[in-house]
Amino acid sequence: MLGFGSMFMDISSELVHSLLPIFMVSVLGASMVTVGVIEGIAEATAAITKVFSGAISDYFRKRKPLVVLGYGLGAITKPVFPLATAIGWVFAARFVDRIGKGIRGAPRDALVADLVPREMRGAAYGLRQALDSVGAFIGPLLAVAFMAWLANDIKAVLWVAVVPAFIAVALLVVAVREPEPAARESGSRCGLTLADAKRLSLRYWLVVGLGGVFTLARFSEAFLVLRALDVGLPLGLVPTIMIVMNVVYAAFAYPAGVVADRIHQRALLVVGLGVLIAADVVLTVATSSALVFIGAGLWGLHMAITQGLLSKLVADAAPDELRGTAFGMFNLVSGGALLVASVIAGGLWSAFGPSATFGAGAGFAAVAAVGLLLYRPRPWDGEHDANT
């Protein structure tokens, strides 16, 4: 049920996200730099919040209350978007919404690890990603349908997102049960301290660094939506870009998670980076909506390969009692990298056009792939699993 709650929130969030970049640029008059800054700050806020929510969930050994609080904040922001008359309203709503995401993110990921055996974690994270992506497919699909029904009235369509958001909160409150603390791990409680950080292995910090470089190469999906508008896709059909991306993501997330439990994970990460490079190259040269659709599909495939795998690597590299903290630190670094990446993406778009934005993304991905190929684990890295 945790996955279904996440799915309903993704229906709501992705309906909003598939239209929000257009709303900011076309209705509220925001520049590309402004879009990049808002998206970057929003995601960085989520990441910073994840550090503390993860540590708190480790300290109190309670994940569910934080997960419910986070989803609740996400739900109450949804009516603000259609009410917005200035870009500041959107920024404030995104800020609070991402605080909610930050509060729920690390405890939710840690709760998944608490509920499943170690050997099934890759599949479990892949299943959660797949359900997220089903919701992320339905959200933009609803956006397209209601844009057609409501004559491209973006504000009216944004009201639709309110309903699934509150369904998600209700599901989590009623149907999700977490194991008792003693069932997870006995021992002293832990908070976010320097001593805790020292207990995290070099293997874990290498995963954190890898996640940061990955994120530099993968800026906000808002720029995919704006790329579709840039090549001339009709306004009411622009959300179909997110549909294509999320269909591919949903189709491949669970199989990729299962594969991650069975083969060399570094090789799988390199494959994921190669797919991201291909997506960026296609989006760099795109002159038609067909090419943007291909690029969006490749983008979704890259996410399916890498996102659940990175979560598995974090879970496997961290002690059980510090798992929430470990996910929080990982998300902090990734969120900071996303802020930098989105600001750079917006600046390049404004100065040189969309091709520069996606070309830079391909460059960052290539650097990450080369670094991953050159890395050789050492005995003191804590990397004993043959698959890692």
Model feature map: region roles:
Residues 1-46, 204-241:
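Helix-loop boundary and gating motifs at the non-cytosolic
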Residues 22-27, 138-158, 340-356:
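Transmembrane alpha-helix termini and helix-breaking/packing motifs in multi-pass membrane transporters
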Residues 49-61, 147, 252-264, 349:
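Helix-to-loop junctions at the C-terminal end of transmembrane segments
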Residues 65-79, 162, 267-282, 362:
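Structural signature of the two symmetry-related core transmembrane helices
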Residues 80-93, 284-295:
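Helix-loop junctions at membrane interfaces in 12-TM secondary transporters
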Residues 93-134:
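Cytoplasmic helix-loop-helix junction between adjacent transmembrane helices
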Residues 162-184, 368-376:
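C-terminal membrane-cytosol helix-exit motif in multi-pass small-molecule transporters
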Residues 178-210:
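Juxtamembrane intracellular "pre-TM" segments in multi-pass secondary transporters
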